[in-house]
């Protein structure tokens, strides 16, 4: 096998293994890959360019983690500390939060990324190789039960409820208001 390329929905070209002789679906696979590689820039399928400026492009943490000094500490009208104390408190809160977050992320960021990467890999693995096959198996197995249940309902319940419906269909109620 040799390295080849394919184009995703966004138009990025990725490297994938290509068979030298092609296959029944793409007999000229190698030649087609060479034509495509001349036209576009190649991206690796397992790497993604990350944005170092906008680190929350999907806005996951907008309403949870975005805590500023004004969200935590507030002095009501008529109860104010000295202006210097207020400014120093603001600076202390902001700088402490900023640098302590950086310290925690430096110490625990990579281990937590490793743990969460392993967790989501296990979760993906279980979903792909256990959950979906179990659900498909259950749906296949439940079809025979649903057919038996359907026959039971049509054989026993439908005639019973039709008979009850015919018995009660002739009941008439007349409401009269007496003056």
Swiss-Prot record:
Residues modified as Phosphotyrosine: 6, 14, 25
GO biological process assignments: angiogenesis; angiotensin-activated signaling pathway; apoptotic signaling pathway; basement membrane organization; calcium ion transport; canonical Wnt signaling pathway; caveola assembly; caveolin-mediated endocytosis
Q: Report residues of the Glycyl lysine isopeptide (Lys-Gly) (interchain with G-Cter in ubiquitin) crosslink.
A: 5, 26, 30, 39, 48, 58
Region (Required for homooligomerization): which ranges?
2-95
Annotated region described as Interacts with SPRY1, SPRY2, and SPRY4, given as residue ranges: 150-161
Region Interaction with CAVIN3, annotated ranges? 83-95
Top-level lineage group: Eukaryota
Sequence positions bearing Phosphoserine = 2, 9, 37
Region feature (Interacts with SPRY1, SPRY2, SPRY3 and SPRY4): 132-143, 168-179
Query: Where found in the cell?
Result: Golgi apparatus membrane; Cell membrane; Membrane, Caveola; Membrane raft
Describe its partners and assembly state. Answer: Homooligomer. Interacts with GLIPR2. Interacts with NOSTRIN. Interacts with SNAP25 and STX1A. Interacts (via the N-terminus) with DPP4; the interaction is direct. Interacts with CTNNB1, CDH1 and JUP. Interacts with PACSIN2; this interaction induces membrane tubulation. Interacts with SLC7A9. Interacts with BMX and BTK. Interacts with TGFBR1. Interacts with CAVIN3 (via leucine-zipper domain) in a cholesterol-sensitive manner. Interacts with CAVIN1. Interacts with EHD2 in a cholesterol-dependent manner.
What job does the chain carry out? May act as a scaffolding protein within caveolar membranes. Forms a stable heterooligomeric complex with CAV2 that targets to lipid rafts and drives caveolae formation. Mediates the recruitment of CAVIN proteins (CAVIN1/2/3/4) to the caveolae. Interacts directly with G-protein alpha subunits and can functionally regulate their activity. Involved in the costimulatory signal essential for T-cell receptor (TCR)-mediated T-cell activation. Its binding to DPP4 induces T-cell proliferation and NF-kappa-B activation in a T-cell receptor/CD3-dependent manner.
The protein, known as? Caveolin-1
